[in-house]
């Protein structure tokens, strides 16, 4: 069973999202380590959302409740947010709703800037991170890979992502009234992560030619070389700030990298009283809000930028949602087929075992021939093909349980299913009950 806990700009404040983003790197591993019944976990954290996707081994209401509470506990511990506040900041989606939600997210339909293209890469990197951490599962792999395919379908079949929508481009739109000549604007880019390339591209599209890059983690030179821009070392940060008209931050640093004292130092170095616009695209925030106490400094942060998100292109959005709904329906159908896979395997194994037994008896009598064996194997393959196909068709129609029952009843087979008594969920429930009695 798939479960998603989601907090976004729709239901949580940016203050909460900022704290959740700090917790994100440790959540999936902790969930897997502490809970046997969670088969996989992928955490997606962006500038406007935090989501934990879980693959729970048993489709039980108890499993859902335990998984949700376990996730709330881990997130609370990692973020420092009170447990009740975490629970109040997340929506829970279960089963079929998870696929449709992630497909919409990866297609940019749930973003602050609807149709923005960066989210698809963030979804892909979330899965890659889970692979690296060893927390993914077969179900989550298929879910996230299908989400990426769906996003590509939305991009190629609708005009939703054709306008280059993104948070950085929206921020530059808002900065337009403050910039007299983009080609003469000197920009300092702070951060070299996945969003830095998109930020640089957006600046260049505006006509900006003077961009320097600074990395709090010391990776400026590695980013600067391939992108053809100068790198700024830590000792030169104040001089770079002093020479800049605009600062764009998109670092993944867990704490603020710029504050009022940096801007005061820059003003002292430049001595020209110039105005500086700081655009903070980081979550957690890269820039301490106290920079606005420095004369001439204006700050655009994610919360402010989000307030100016454009209205949706209704036609393109409707087309995209239709693609998402179709993809989600197909994902549900394919997942339903998996439910009857043990029964189909058991049926095929039984029939081919019977065939092998008969062939062995024929060989012992000396009546066997290669042609006879080949013909019998072909006949059995033909006979089991239609029931196998029909089983998958019935599963897609929601009749998977009947297929399993029929195979067991007609052939006397014991289709292997998880043992509820010794299951991780049962054990967890037992522990919970014991803890309640002890208290």
From Swiss-Prot:
Disulfide bonds: none annotated. The keyword NADP applies. Pfam families: GlutR_dimer (PF00745), GlutR_N (PF05201), Shikimate_DH (PF01488). It comes from Clavibacter michiganensis subsp. michiganensis (strain NCPPB 382). The active site is at residue 47. The lineage of its organism: Bacteria, Bacillati, Actinomycetota, Actinomycetes, Micrococcales. The record marks 101 as: Important for activity. Belongs to the glutamyl-tRNA reductase family. This is Glutamyl-tRNA reductase. Pathway: Porphyrin-containing compound metabolism; protoporphyrin-IX biosynthesis; 5-aminolevulinate from L-glutamyl-tRNA(Glu): step 1/2. It catalyses: (S)-4-amino-5-oxopentanoate + tRNA(Glu) + NADP(+) = L-glutamyl-tRNA(Glu) + NADPH + H(+). GO terms for molecular function: glutamyl-tRNA reductase activity; NADP binding. Gene3D superfamilies: Glutamyl-tRNA reductase, N-terminal domain, NAD(P)-binding Rossmann-like Domain. Possesses an unusual extended V-shaped dimeric structure with each monomer consisting of three distinct domains arranged along a curved 'spinal' alpha-helix. The N-terminal catalytic domain specifically recognizes the glutamate moiety of the substrate. The second domain is the NADPH-binding domain, and the third C-terminal domain is responsible for dimerization.
